[in-house]
Amino acid sequence: MGLKEDFEEHAEKAKTLPENTTNENKLILYGLYKQATVGPVNTSRPGMFNMRDRAKWDAWKAVEGKSTEEAMSDYITKVKQLLGEAAASA
């Protein structure tokens, strides 16, 4: 299985993460996903009254230097880690 296919499989698995997954971890996944699928941030930072979108933008901006392949690989690793933690606490 290639990296892209593995990434897509883990993107589906990420949807099964428990509801108690921290916002911090969700934002890390969001940033890596956007970097892997879109590339560097291509929008302006949302205003200060739009906290949710601003946090998502910041998470994406934080991984801006990663290549598509690095972002995919890091995303897969993070999903595996979170699924492992969820299984251990179940």
From Swiss-Prot:
List the top taxonomic levels of the source: Eukaryota, Viridiplantae, Streptophyta, Embryophyta, Tracheophyta
Q: Which family does it belong to?
A: Belongs to the ACBP family.
Output this protein's name.
Answer: Acyl-CoA-binding protein
Q: Does the keyword Transport apply?
A: yes
Q: What does this protein do?
A: Binds medium- and long-chain acyl-CoA esters with very high affinity and may function as an intracellular carrier of acyl-CoA esters.
Q: Which residues bind an acyl-CoA?
A: Y30, G31, L32, Y33, K34, K56, Y75
Tell me the superkingdom of the source: Eukaryota
| Feature: compositional bias, Basic and acidic residues | 1-16
Give the UniProt keywords, A-Z.
Lipid-binding, Transport
Instruction: One Pfam family, please name it.
Output: ACBP
Q: Where in this protein does the record put region Disordered? A: 1-20
List the GO molecular function terms: fatty-acyl-CoA binding
InterPro entries in the cross-refs: Acyl-CoA-binding_prot_CS, Acyl-CoA-binding_protein, Acyl-CoA-binding_sf, FERM/acyl-CoA-bd_prot_sf
Q: Which SUPFAM superfamilies does the entry mention? A: Acyl-CoA binding protein (SSF47027)
